């Protein structure tokens, strides 16, 4: 029985041969194809696979019937009889098979009316793969002859091969790192993993070091192979080193995925050019062909029901993926009209998309009416002079109209205080289908400017005073509000703790601890506008158990105070980190033992509460746009409350490469459509909710640790997603993956998430404590490697940025306790 390792090796070799076994194609040559060439029936089926041990005989039988002539090819090259190859009828026999006989074999049966091809995939296995050095055909470049008398320290001989530092590849693939170097005397090479010596016993299956090629080879990589690999080259005159980072992506095998809408229907005129594009995504090496549907004797299908097809373009030995994904047709004729198909296959299956080409007759050129060049030039000059004259008259008229006599302030004995009312308009974040009756253009305050005399000051002073309208429903007396200690500084102000007497109308004489948002001393008009907009947004949203609710405001006779609910246990991210068990590799404080150990049900409860809060915001047509654990607060009774949903954000001026004050990148919570197209919807909030779930089940982990922003953009476009957290069931992880669906319409709604989480929470017992100290399974497709955990104490071993207090949120003391609904 073939072992799993040999089976994986077979699949890899098979897909490699698929990419090499297609004859090269030139479109210019295709235009000269003889029209009487019989069409080929394309066999859309799984090729037969043969596995032969070295030294054995390989025998293939062509299963095609009624063949006048049978011809054989290997990797697109015709096969003839020799001392090892025997051709007898429909049989092909190769004696003493070697690994070089591996490849793609095809038999073609030529008939009087058509031809048909049958494909075989052959793999001659060997104990040690002979393909380790397939990329080393240019190894002569790495060997540098040194003059014996020219002693020198090590140096790199081929830096072009070392430019790609970050390598992301699917699991079970082979990875090779190279460090071509020279030096005299001859240098030695050692490899380190994560700064420590890399030994054979550190990896199941070991690894290979090819000193003559300065390379490290790891076969069948798994998630535990993630990390930094450093080659250290040294001799007695010095040493040099180079580091690669490997990220292993565990993904389920699937047939090729073709981008929707490609290739697209096209139309052109006779003599024009056209191109069809086919975007193929596949973990395994895909084989791509371009096919045209043709007719034979007025029929598109043969007697057996199979369509008549002609292969126009296929991958050859020197063809790249980018070249094969585009089909160019030059100097189009009416015969080129018809249906074209892009077909891609791998070892899992086949996918195809079709498009139609419509050829139109060339338009008849109308007789050009040419005006006299003299009259045309005169007309241009006249129009230009007229436009310039109009501009000059307009400028003079505007200046005469706006010129007024300026007041002489030096003759006035008193100082004038400028009282300015800031023009604010409602800046609410609502979806396009919002049916709110409140007009977003209704002005909150109209601008007025007046000069008032005061004789107490000796010189002019410009003082801005903000006059806001009073809202009786929300206005709270200042004399009943006692400010306390600061809790933190926000984006446009600060937050302090306070005691509000009578803010709870059911208990008019009882003091309630609240949080008060206010402007800083150096606040600008924009800061005031943002704070008022947030207050107005919270008024419109209303109250819910799982959001930070507005309690009141002080807008008259003093600075603006916005009074909101107080959450004593701070933000959710630090709340989870403070409750990480001791001994956990990424423990927040390894010397502190938590008073209560969190259960799996506690984490599900956190997720359920936040889903309820987002369901309510979505029902109020509110799009959050910055949903993350740092923007969730926890109350004394462990109730999750979503914060900062009313902040005004300028989505057109986001610096996607700029870190926040705590060193983390907000783009890691953003959906692809928000990241690349700046489209914010409820579906983009669902994506962020999936990342928030991942933060919860990693107990405050940082998403995509150590991945640069540029690489993150690339990985998201390629379909990469984060692995399953340790403390997460497959059902919850699939819920995260649904939230991260590339198509926004395919993501679940918050209503569906609430229903699913409610069911999971009901079936979960209270005794399921988190056992985070157990080692992770090295070959599990959903568990990351413990040696390179994605949630280390400082968020990432690759990002040494410090973690100060959260921006826009207060810092609260941590109080242990389980999470309850």
UniProtKB/Swiss-Prot annotation:
SUPFAM superfamilies: Immunoglobulin, Protein kinase-like (PK-like). One of its GO terms (biological process) is embryonic organ morphogenesis. GO terms for cellular component: cytoplasmic vesicle; excitatory synapse; extracellular region; Golgi apparatus; nucleus; plasma membrane. Residues 22-377 are extracellular. The chain crosses the membrane at residues 378-398. The modification Phosphoserine is found at residue 780. Its EC number is 2.7.10.1. It is an enzyme of class 2 (transferase). Disulfide bonds join 62-107, 179-231, 278-342. GO terms for molecular function: ATP binding; fibroblast growth factor binding; fibroblast growth factor receptor activity; heparin binding. Residues 481-770 form the Protein kinase domain. Present in an inactive conformation in the absence of bound ligand. Ligand binding leads to dimerization and activation by autophosphorylation on tyrosine residues. Residues 129-151 are annotated as: Disordered. Residues 161-178 are annotated as: Heparin-binding. It comes from the Eukaryota. Keywords: Apoptosis, ATP-binding, Cell membrane, Cytoplasmic vesicle, Disulfide bond, Glycoprotein, Golgi apparatus, Heparin-binding, Immunoglobulin domain, Kinase, Membrane, Nucleotide-binding, Phosphoprotein, Proto-oncogene, Receptor, Repeat, Signal, Transferase, Transmembrane, Transmembrane helix, Tyrosine-protein kinase, Ubl conjugation. PANTHER family: FIBROBLAST GROWTH FACTOR RECEPTOR 2, TYROSINE-PROTEIN KINASE RECEPTOR. Monomer. Homodimer after ligand binding. Interacts predominantly with FGF1 and FGF2, but can also interact with FGF3, FGF4, FGF6, FGF7, FGF8, FGF9, FGF10, FGF17, FGF18 and FGF22 (in vitro). Ligand specificity is determined by tissue-specific expression of isoforms, and differences in the third Ig-like domain are crucial for ligand specificity. Affinity for fibroblast growth factors (FGFs) is increased by heparan sulfate glycosaminoglycans that function as coreceptors. Likewise, KLB increases the affinity for FGF19 and FGF21. Interacts with PLCG1. Interacts with GRB2 and PAK4. Tyrosine-protein kinase that acts as a cell-surface receptor for fibroblast growth factors and plays an essential role in the regulation of cell proliferation, differentiation, migration and apoptosis, and in the regulation of embryonic development. Required for normal embryonic patterning, trophoblast function, limb bud development, lung morphogenesis, osteogenesis and skin development. Plays an essential role in the regulation of osteoblast differentiation, proliferation and apoptosis, and is required for normal skeleton development. Belongs to the protein kinase superfamily. Tyr protein kinase family. Fibroblast growth factor receptor subfamily. This is Fibroblast growth factor receptor 2. It comes from Mus musculus. The gene is Fgfr2.
């Amino acid at each position: 029985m073939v072992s799993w390792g040999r089976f994986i090796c077979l699949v890899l070799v098979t897909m490699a041969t698929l990419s090499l076994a297609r004859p090269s194609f030139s479109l210019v040559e295709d235009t000269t194809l003889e029209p009487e060439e019989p069409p080929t029936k394309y066999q859309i089926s799984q090729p037969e696979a043969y596995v032969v041990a070295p030294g054995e005989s390989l025998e293939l039988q062509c299963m095609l019937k009624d063949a006048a002539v049978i011809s054989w090819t290997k990797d697109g090259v015709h096969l003839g009889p020799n001392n090892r190859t025997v051709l007898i009828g429909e049989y092909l026999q190769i004696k003493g098979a070697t690994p070089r006989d591996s490849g793609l074999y095809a038999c073609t049966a030529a008939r009087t009316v058509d031809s048909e091809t049958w494909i075989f995939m052959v793999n001659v296995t060997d104990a040690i793969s002979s393909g380790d050095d397939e990329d080393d055909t240019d190894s002569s470049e790495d060997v540098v002859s040194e003059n014996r008398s020219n002693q020198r320290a090590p140096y790199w001989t081929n830096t072009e091969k070392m430019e790609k530092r970050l390598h992301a590849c699917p699991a079970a693939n082979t990875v090779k790192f190279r460090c071509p170097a020279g030096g005299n005397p001859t240098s030695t090479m050692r490899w380190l993993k994560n700064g420590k010596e890399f030994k054979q016993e550190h990896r199941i299956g070991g690894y290979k070091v090819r000193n003559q090629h300065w390379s490290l080879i790891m076969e069948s990589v798994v998630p535990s192979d993630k990390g930094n690999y450093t080659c250290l080259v040294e001799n007695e005159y010095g040493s040099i080193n180079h580091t690669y980072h490997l990220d292993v992506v565990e993904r389920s095998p699937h047939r090729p995925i073709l981008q929707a809408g490609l290739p697209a229907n096209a139309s052109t005129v006779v003599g024009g050019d056209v191109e069809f594009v086919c975007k193929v995504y596949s973990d395994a090496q895909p084989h791509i062909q371009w096919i045209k549907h043709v007719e034979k004797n007025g029929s598109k299908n043969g007697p057996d029901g199979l369509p008549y097809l002609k292969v126009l373009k296929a991958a050859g030995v020197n063809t790249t993926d980018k070249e094969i994904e585009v089909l160019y047709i030059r100097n189009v004729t009416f015969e080129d009209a018809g249906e074209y198909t892009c077909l891609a296959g791998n070892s899992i299956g086949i996918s195809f998309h079709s498009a139609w080409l419509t050829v139109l007759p060339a338009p008849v050129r109308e007789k050009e009416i040419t005006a006299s060049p003299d009259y045309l030039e005169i007309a241009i000059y006249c129009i230009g002079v007229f436009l310039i004259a109009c501009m000059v008259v307009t400028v003079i008229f505007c200046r005469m109209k706006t010129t007024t006599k300026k007041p002489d302030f030096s003759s006035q004995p008193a100082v004038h205080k400028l009282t300015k009312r800031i023009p604010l308009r409602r800046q609410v974040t609502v979806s396009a289908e919002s049916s709110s009756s409140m007009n977003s253009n209704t002005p909150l305050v109209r601008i007025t400017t007046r000069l008032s005399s005061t004789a107490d000051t000796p010189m002019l002073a410009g003082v801005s005073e903000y006059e806001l309208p009073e809202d009786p429903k929300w206005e709270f007396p200042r004399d009943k509000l006692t400010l306390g200690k600061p809790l933190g500084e926000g984006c446009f102000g600060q937050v302090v703790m306070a005691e509000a007497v009578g803010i709870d109308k059911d208990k008019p004489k009882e003091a309630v601890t609240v949080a008060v948002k206010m402007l800083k001393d150096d606040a600008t008009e924009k800061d005031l506008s943002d704070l008022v907009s947030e207050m107005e947004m919270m008024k419109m949203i209303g109250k819910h158990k799982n959001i930070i609710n507005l309690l009141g405001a002080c807008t008259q006779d003093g600075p603006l105070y916005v009074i909101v609910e107080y959450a004593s246990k701070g933000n959710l991210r630090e709340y989870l980190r403070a409750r990480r068990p001791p001994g956990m590799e990424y423990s927040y404080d390894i010397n502190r033992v938590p008073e209560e150990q969190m259960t799996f049900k506690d984490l599900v409860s956190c997720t359920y509460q936040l889903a309820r809060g987002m369901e309510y915001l979505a029902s109020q047509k509110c799009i959050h746009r910055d949903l993350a654990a740092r923007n969730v607060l926890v109350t004394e009774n462990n109730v999750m409350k979503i914060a900062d949903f009313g902040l005004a954000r300028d989505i057109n001026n986001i610096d996607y490469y700029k870190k926040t004050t705590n060193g983390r990148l907000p783009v890691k919570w953003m959906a692809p459509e928000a990241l690349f197209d700046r489209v914010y919807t409820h579906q983009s909030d669902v994506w962020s909710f999936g990342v928030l779930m991942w933060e919860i089940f990693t107990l405050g982990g940082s998403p995509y640790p150590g991945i640069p922003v540029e690489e993150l953009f690339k990985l998201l476009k390629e379909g990469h997603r984060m692995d399953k957290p340790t403390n997460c069931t497959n059902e919850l992880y699939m819920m995260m993956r649904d939230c991260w669906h590339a198509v926004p319409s395919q993501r679940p709604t918050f209503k569906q998430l609430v229903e699913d989480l409610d069911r999971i929470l009901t079936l979960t017992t209270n005794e399921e404590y988190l056992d985070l100290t157990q080692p992770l399974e090295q070959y599990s497709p959903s568990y990351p490697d413990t040696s390179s955990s994605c949630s280390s104490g400082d968020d990432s071993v690759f990002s040494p940025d410090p973690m100060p207090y959260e921006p826009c949120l207060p810092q609260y003391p941590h109080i242990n306790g389980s999470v309850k609904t």
